[in-house]
Amino acid sequence: MKKISITLLLCLLCLTGMAQGQKALDLKDITSGRFRPENIQGVIPMPDGEHYTQMNADGTQIIKYSFKTGEKVEVIFDVSTARECDFKNFDSYQFSPDGQKLLIATKTTPIYRHSYTAVHYIYPLKRNDKGVTTNNIIERLSDGGPQQVPVFSPDGTMIAFVRNNNIFLVKLLYGNSESQITEDGKQNSVINGIPDWVYEEEFGFDRALEFSADNTLIAFIRFDESEVPSYSFPVFAGQAPRIDALKDYPGEYTYKYPKAGYPNSKVEVRTYDIKSHVTRTMKLPLDADGYIPRIRFTKDANKLAIMTLNRHQDRFDLYFADPRSTLCKLMLRDESPYYIKENIFDNIQFYPEYFSMLSERDGYSHLYWYSMGGNLIKKVTNGKFEVKDFLGYDEEDGSFYYTSNEESPLRKAVYKIDKKGKKTKLSQQAGTNTPLFSKSMKYYMNKFSSLDTPMLVTLNDNSGKTLKTLITNDALKQTLSGYAVPQKEFFTFQTTDGVKLNGWMMKPVNFSASKKYPVLMYQYSGPGSQQVLDTWGISWETYMASLGYIVVCVDGRGTGGRGEAFEKCTYLKIGVKEAKDQVETALYLGKQAYVDKNRIGIWGWSYGGYMTLMSMSEGTPVFKAGVAVAAPTDWRFYDTIYTERFMRTPKENAEGYKESSAFTRADKLHGNLLLVHGMADDNVHFQNCAEYAEQLVQLGKQFDMQVYTNRNHGIYGGNTRQHLYTRLTNFFLNNL
């Protein structure tokens, strides 16, 4: 396969496929999304507990459906009929808590992974006695410019939002009067109500702003990032989109980015009294360098929940603050000899008398139930499996709903435990189930897929009974039947350390055990991640298998789904055991009669790119070629929250950082290497690629490199993805 062009290879494969009545896959089919399953977008359960809404495909309507029947009830919003509507389509929407108003987002502009600005509109849904909307005039939320994270008050009469790092309040009963709550917000200095870059990226949220249950207070987190070091990257005129203002001289984007060991933002929780206009700062006993990853008002307006972590992230505290006296009381503490996983925050849900929590205190992630006084009532789940998500508690019958991998680390199922402790599995098929429950907990929409089943969407009641099938993707199955598509199969093997690892393998369609095939290994390998899952997908790896490669993915030590001991065994020295496991995978594959052991390659993106470099320089010359896309190369270059969670600081763990650096073992790099990076990567900075490339140059190591102008960590836009995957394909065709 060496030095063969894609065009020639596809011609040969097409001739073979045509003889069988099937077409060969084309790279454009993959990058264009031709085989992307049909899905339901923009689904929101309505406050009444009986209905849900969804956007239509072109973003012009919001349609109401019955959870019980799946039948369309009515169109509750249409851009063509809403009076004084000055936009043609919209991007997203939300309901007021009472279900009487819509907040509609248009002209959405992404900022980072979760954050964006948008122009929002308010639309009334109130009906008269005849069920007719009494006022269908749509109004702008604000004329002062795009907004971030707008949130309704519980009674639906107010909306708070952030603009330019300051918080604003709009009172809907007073002609949408707008007032500014904070005045000190300033770019790269002070942020109110939204997280800074590292909080957003690593704690996974974009709003730090909450109303109290009695509509009298707004609580928010204030970030002072003035002492956080800045990072800048160049911005060029580029293409797709073109920035004409930079056609002669490039610009620069600067933002605050705390690298491992450097200062974080100073954080505090404040409350604003809407009536008296008084702002108070909570007296929170937080370490000077501690984190506040979430705040949330409970059902009691006098109890503001504040979640904190110490900088090592091995101690989690939940405080209840009195928003007026500012006093804080510790309600719960959870500690780990390693670190507390970030999925804990959104699985804490508050009810009038109770709250939920996920903890790994017994070695596996399980659901715990507490009184609002902070006393443990019971451990709801138990066993050598992981609870993935707490879905909710039915206050009427005392039942708990959650997803877990009890069946297999590769699968996710939906379960119910009633108040007597009886457990019932609700999901009917083995694979990956992702449910969305109604507000009443009586119904749920389930999205299911498995290795051989693309997205299947059903409506179910809370006993698991299927009420209606919404999406089958039969049309996609019919389309795929005309193509020669390689299929995944699971396998396991045991390493020389006696560790059992899970993997999947895709063989070429016309696989023959009497032949020897080149192998391309794909992996991510990051802490807590999983790539080996019983879920459906067609990707670039599928395309490579169609070209005659055996494609393999193995989740090594440090990945998720198998309990704390397996996942956290890499603590303080990430990258070392993971690389050894990828090398052992290659050695295991090389012993198979159908594998050409001299033609094994590896690739990955982000942490997977880092693992490519670590594996190719592990000291065992088993890889002939590898591609590292957007790879961190030295953890001193990466952010505080992610890096220190697993490694602590460079000062505390100097030897661990040295062993975990791709620089340390670069002299042992073996095989043909392609480095790929976006120059506008705000997450894994281009610095990682540039410095590692210089290291290879000085070591006399030859390598290939592909740089993408103005592209971030995702490396997309215009023709970029097509170019990227063509580059990767050609590299492996010529070097493997």
Task: Name each model-derived stretch.
Residues I40-I44, E50-I62, D91, L103-A105, ...:
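Non-catalytic accessory segments flanking enzyme active sites
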Residues T53-G59, S66, F95-P97, L103-H114, ...:
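Beta-strand C-termini and the immediately following turn/loop, strongest in propeller blades
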Residues G70-E71, K107-Y112, Y116-V119, I181-L209, ...:
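Predominantly five- to eight-bladed beta-propeller fold
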Residues I221-I377:
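Beta-propeller domains
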